[in-house]
């Protein structure tokens, strides 16, 4: 007899190891999973919500673009709130500070740390929560969509639902750049199990459905998985990348200069690729079609992803609503998952993506921390000295095996 509907999780073609680097972006649920990853790996190998908790797909895309290409943040995202603190329209309240300088220092330090981790990352976890966005009625150069309202007056904002087509357009414009610049990276999408009662349960379900449709489209979309650079077709160069950069500029409320800079920095990775830019089109017209294809393949090889399939979906949302279909798995507000539910989903996540080495690595620090936390009744006794020596030996063996000390 069965009393639940187990969710089948498709096997993934990769596993995380003790040497892995991971970036986690998104909702409160992303924060919960990220904190557990931080206990399994050294802090410098995991970056969890470097912009704070984010919910909206476009806000996540904007944050990822900044992290991926380390472009300076706009000046007008910073403002002084009603509480006397300085905030950022692009960040959660965790970065608020008494002065503008301190707020800016905090967000820049977090951005730089996330960029460093992403350079080596095996996995990027993206957790979406809602497509309801809040827009400033007064347009700023940094765009009007905010990550957090920071308890400012509601009359300053307009709530809008982002259409499925708009959300897809945002990510189809960005993902090819991410894939080209980070060929080793894989993306694991999830949808937050949190339900938005303030929108009504029906609209909450519709919002989650749109996010799931967006993710499914992106995983299978040719546009989201192609090469973002100019392509050769006969003797002509298409303007696909120019159109994409224009689209990204519209999305993020900036001029195309940022994306020109991104493209230039990526082009530097290949000395030969510049011959396929528009300004060099004439110089390639004398080549035969075969020669052009050979030269193009050589030039773009460094932008080819080292993984065949790079986007995947993890069914955290389905686990809570179907497999754990009981109010005992919800927090007291009946909307958030309980700690027990998060632990259950985390264990399923571990079973899916952790290698045996990482599972072994993640289990040791807990027992070592317990040993270090032990307060002996007789610290001068032979038994405690043996216990202490054995604990230090375990720490040394762990460090030698995995290359870092247990946290």
Where are each of the predicted segments found?
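A short mid-domain helix/strand-loop element embedded in enzyme catalytic domains
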Residues: 129-155, 186-188
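Conserved catalytic region of serine esterases and O-acyltransferases that act on ester linkages
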Residues: 6, 330-334, 343-407
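Serine-esterase "nucleophile elbow" of acetyl-processing enzymes
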Residues: 1-75, 214-217
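Active-site segments of SGNH/GDSL-like serine hydrolases
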Residues: 5, 131, 176-205, 315, ...
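Surface-exposed cleft-lining segments at the edges of enzyme active sites
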Residues: 96-101, 105, 149-169, 196-203
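A cross-taxon signal for low-complexity, glycine/charged-rich
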Residues: 235-250, 254-257, 270, 275-278, ...
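Conserved SGNH/GDSL esterase-like catalytic core that processes O-acyl groups on lipids
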Residues: 32, 43-126, 130-135, 156
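Extracellular serine-dependent O-acyl
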Residues: 186-188, 212-227, 308-326, 362-363
């Amino acid at each position: 007899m069965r009393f639940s509907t187990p969710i089948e999780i498709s096997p993934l073609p990769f596993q995380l190891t003790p040497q892995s680097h991971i970036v986690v972006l998104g909702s409160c649920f992303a924060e919960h999973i990220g904190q557990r990853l931080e206990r399994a790996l050294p802090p410098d190998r995991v970056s969890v919500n470097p912009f704070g908790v984010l919910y909206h797909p476009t806000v996540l895309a904007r944050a990822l673009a900044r992290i991926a290409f380390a472009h300076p943040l706009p000046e007008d995202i910073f403002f002084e709130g009603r509480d006397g603190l300085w905030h950022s329209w692009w960040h959660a309240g965790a970065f608020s500070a008494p002065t503008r300088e301190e707020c800016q220092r905090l967000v820049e330090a977090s951005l730089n740390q996330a960029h460093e981790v992403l350079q080596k990352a095996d996995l990027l976890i993206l957790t979406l929560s809602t497509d309801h966005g809040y827009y400033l009625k007064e347009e700023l150069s940094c765009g009007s969509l905010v990550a957090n309202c920071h308890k400012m007056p509601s009359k300053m904002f307009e709530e809008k639902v982002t259409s499925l087509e708009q959300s897809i357009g945002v990510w189809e414009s960005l993902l090819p750049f991410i894939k080209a610049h980070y060929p080793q990276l894989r993306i694991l999408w999830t949808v937050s199990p949190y339900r938005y009662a303030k929108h009504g349960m029906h609209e909450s379900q519709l919002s989650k459905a749109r996010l799931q449709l967006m993710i499914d489209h992106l995983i299978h979309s040719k546009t989201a998985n192609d090469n973002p650079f100019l392509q050769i077709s006969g003797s002509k160069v298409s303007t696909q990348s120019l159109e994409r950069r224009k689209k990204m500029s519209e999305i993020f409320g900036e001029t195309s200069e940022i994306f020109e800079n991104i493209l230039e920095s990526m082009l530097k990775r290949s000395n030969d690729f510049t011959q396929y830019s528009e300004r060099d089109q004439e110089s390639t017209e004398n080549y035969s079609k075969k020669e052009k294809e050979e030269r193009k393949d050589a030039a773009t090889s460094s932008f080819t992803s080292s993984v065949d399939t790079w986007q995947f979906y993890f069914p955290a949302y389905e686990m809570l609503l179907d497999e754990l279909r009981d109010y005992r798995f919800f927090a007291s507000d009946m909307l958030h998952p309980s700690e027990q539910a998060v632990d259950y989903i985390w264990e399923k996540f571990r079973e899916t993506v952790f290698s045996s080495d990482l599972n072994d690595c993640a289990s040791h620090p807990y027992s070592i921390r317990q040993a270090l936390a032990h307060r002996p009744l007789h610290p001068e006794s032979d038994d405690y000295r043996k216990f202490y020596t054995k604990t230090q030996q375990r720490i040394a063996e762990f460090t030698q095996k995995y290359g870092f000390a247990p946290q």
